[in-house]
Amino acid sequence: MLSAVIGGGLLAAGAVPGIGYWRYSAPGPLPETKALVIPPGGYASTIAALQEGGALRNDMPDVWIFRAAIALTRREGQLHAAELQFPAYGSMRDLLNVLRHGQPVRHPITIPEGLAAKQILTVLNEAPLLSGKIDTLPEGDVLPQTYYYLRNTGRGALVARMKLAMQRAVSHVWENRDPSAGLQDPEQMVILASIVEKETGLPAERPHVARVFLNRLRLGMKLQADPTTIYALTDGAGRLGRALTHADMGIQSPYNTYVTAGLPPTPICSPGLASLEAVAHPAPGDDLYFVAAGDGTHRFTPSLNEHNRNVSALRTVRGSGADMAPSVTHP
């Protein structure tokens, strides 16, 4: 039916029998696969968007043929207003198939592990294809991973998805935790996981780092974790940009675990799933100290004397800073 009508009935378009249908099925002008935003507003706005995007020729015969094809195939479904992916050299037939049955383009956005809330807000507010604005975000509330969204998705709606993902992850990890870890509640698990996340980038070390902090909490020792002090100094804005000093260790802040016992009041970043799992399933052992070895790894020990020897040896190798903080867990 479509072939007969388009081929023989569009004489007003300059078509002779068969020519109209040939143009309907012939390769289109789009030189490469391309995403086009099809706005609402009916056939005219759809055709204009296709022409502007280079998917439909800007001449009256093609426009008439395309309009006729829309009408004659209307039982196949409505045309959708969305951002859609059109194939290279797609024919009018292909264009209509995409307009009716194509899936909207989904855009990725990645929240890296270990970002603080202020940094996550920057990532979200600078994403050009999202809409709206968010001004605040509780620390540690979103799960770091890659999310996919449609153009013009509201930032608030995307954050709600991120929060739900974190809630589900925390619930799953908490329900399957090692009871001997001694964690009191999921909130404590997330806070400690955020510190572990910032302490080491090596997944294999995270359960060991978690064990050190859990042992120190159990014994009533201060955590003395550098990332908490950095968070206090920067107000969660990001990197400190310099080495910590002895004076830094003495700042009065509930986030400075050199002066404040126990855990900080909130997470210091959004921990990834691996850090949550590390805290829920810590490595066995009695270690209470660790020091960065300078190659991305750490040296662990249960003895302060041995720890101090490790610190001295590493300072000899790397050179001692004039105002290097005498950290219990780092040189």
Predicted regions and their residues:
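Conserved SxxK-family serine transpeptidase/carboxypeptidase catalytic domain
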Residues: Q224-C269, A274
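Conserved catalytic or metal-liganding residues and their short signature motifs at active sites
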Residues: M1-T234, C269-A274, A278-D286, G294-P331
